Amino acid sequence: MKIAIDGMGGDNAPSAVVEGVVSALKEYSEMTFYITGPEDKISLELSKYDYPKDKIIIIDAKEVISTNEHPVMALRRKKDSSIVKALNLVKDAHCDGIISAGSTGAFLAGCTLIVGRIKGVERPALGPIMPGRRGNFMIVDAGANVDSKPEYLVQFSKMGSIYYKNVFNVDIPSVGLLNIGAEEEKGNDLTKATYKLLKEENSINFVGNIEPRYIPTGDTNIIVSDGFAGNTALKMYEGSAKNILGMIKDEVLKADLKSKIGVLLLKPFLKRIMKKFDYKEYGGAPFLGVNGICIKAHGSSDGKAFKNAIRQTKIFYENNVLDEIKKEFEKKN
């Protein structure tokens, strides 16, 4: 498997990118990585490690697209940027997938415009995997499409179901529609119309509306929504988890000695919970519906996060998720 890596994407690039790639190569020796970015900077970082030289290839790219640039304009203007060169490697079928922790807007726009959509897919969607009490769940769309149509959400449900089925070995993943109430008549025009379409779609295991308070249980495998609501729910969930853990720490500091000793006994359990909510463990979010394996890593990813993003890309590839999505949409054309 060959993976294109945006060597200058993210707050900690290129050091964290190179660290993650070298670390992953120790575990996945069959892989080959193409890191895009200024050759001198990437070479300097690589010189710190011992690795098989034929397994990491540098693709020189002089420019970088920052997060404050207009995504589409930057993609058109900066043809020699690390992200554009990485995307072209996938477009030209030189690489099987791409990972970037750079500008989300530029990455998503680039995946759509350069790599291209799968035939039949109206809008690609971002689908991060999150930890739930009784299992992982996917939120799709989590921010790629702020404005959506009911038909788009049905497609998001299909792509999310295919991903979840093949990656987590769940034969019939459940799909819930993010809404303000469980009843069918609740919500706005978008959710009401989407509910009707999902209920009629035989290829989806639609279980009805799901309120945000029930998302963390993990009982529903795929939470489908427009990008605005999905991104809001995702960030609220991430923020709540961090704040609850922070509140526990604050209370421990104020507690008496006896209580602190009790907390020490719980430390292994608390560590496991904290690990579940650490974005580094998940690597990144798949961008579903484009004609390639595209993984968006967190902007502040470190070496560990990049390594796990590589692992996630490998799982996507080995489980033929891309081909399965293509097959589903070929039926409709």
UniProtKB/Swiss-Prot annotation:
Any one GO CC term of the record: cytoplasm
Catalysed reaction, written as an equation: a fatty acyl-[ACP] + phosphate = an acyl phosphate + holo-[ACP]
GO biological process: fatty acid biosynthetic process; phospholipid biosynthetic process
Main location: cytoplasm
Keyword Lipid biosynthesis: yes
Compartment annotation: Cytoplasm
GO molecular function: phosphate:acyl-[acyl carrier protein] acyltransferase activity
Summary of subunit composition and partner proteins: Homodimer. Probably interacts with PlsY.
NCBIfam families according to UniProt: plsX
Protein name: Phosphate acyltransferase
Species, as recorded: Clostridium botulinum (strain Alaska E43 / Type E3)
